[in-house]
Amino acid sequence: MESLHKRILEEGQALSENVLKVDSFLNHQVDPELMYEMGTYFKNYFENHKITKVFTIESSGIAPAVMTAMQMNLPMVTLKKQNSKILNGDVYQTTVHSFTKSLDYELTLSKKYINDEDNILVIDDFLANGEAALGAARLIEEAGAKVAGIGIVIEKSFQKGAQMLKDKGYDVYSLARIAKLSKGIIEFVK
């Protein structure tokens, strides 16, 4: 996605070999037009996958997931990173390790928003080691539903996540694939 590549190069900051800061358009301030375009790309790639719902993990995946769901005319479900009292314990949960924050959290899904006939598209902002996407897939499959695909805004291709998910049979589609990060340098996969 050329417009995303351009924004990453113009506004993104490689803070280290593993950390890319894109808070000016994706995960602090959000550019709605760019999110809409992302939704179009995800819709076009996954439109023949017979998807019934779009899932994401709070919070930075919400904007691209909403735009994708809107364009596919489907509901969007947010997987919670902490348990909520209003969920009343009728949930699926799995432990996920956050690469960015270096901590574990309980990914939570209310049982009333999934059934065994669902074919789910998971949308997330970043893919590094694949723990978040794999955790989402575990919840979906625990409910008896299927993972139709995994859409990623920015994939860190130099980390193991994308290959690990593909090796497990998931259809992973990334809008931007980063080959290398170093202080001040961002290189895309050719």
Swiss-Prot record:
The keyword Phosphoprotein does not apply. It comes from the Bacteria. GO terms for molecular function: xanthine phosphoribosyltransferase activity. GO terms for cellular component: cytoplasm. GO terms for biological process: purine ribonucleoside salvage; xanthine metabolic process; XMP salvage. Keywords: Cytoplasm, Glycosyltransferase, Purine salvage, Transferase. 5-phospho-alpha-D-ribose 1-diphosphate binds at residues 128-132. Pathway: Purine metabolism; XMP biosynthesis via salvage pathway; XMP from xanthine: step 1/1. Its EC number is 2.4.2.22. Xanthine binds at residues 20, 27, 156. It catalyses: XMP + diphosphate = xanthine + 5-phospho-alpha-D-ribose 1-diphosphate. The keyword Acyltransferase does not apply. It is found in: Cytoplasm. Homodimer. Belongs to the purine/pyrimidine phosphoribosyltransferase family. Xpt subfamily. Converts the preformed base xanthine, a product of nucleic acid breakdown, to xanthosine 5'-monophosphate (XMP), so it can be reused for RNA or DNA synthesis. This is Xanthine phosphoribosyltransferase.
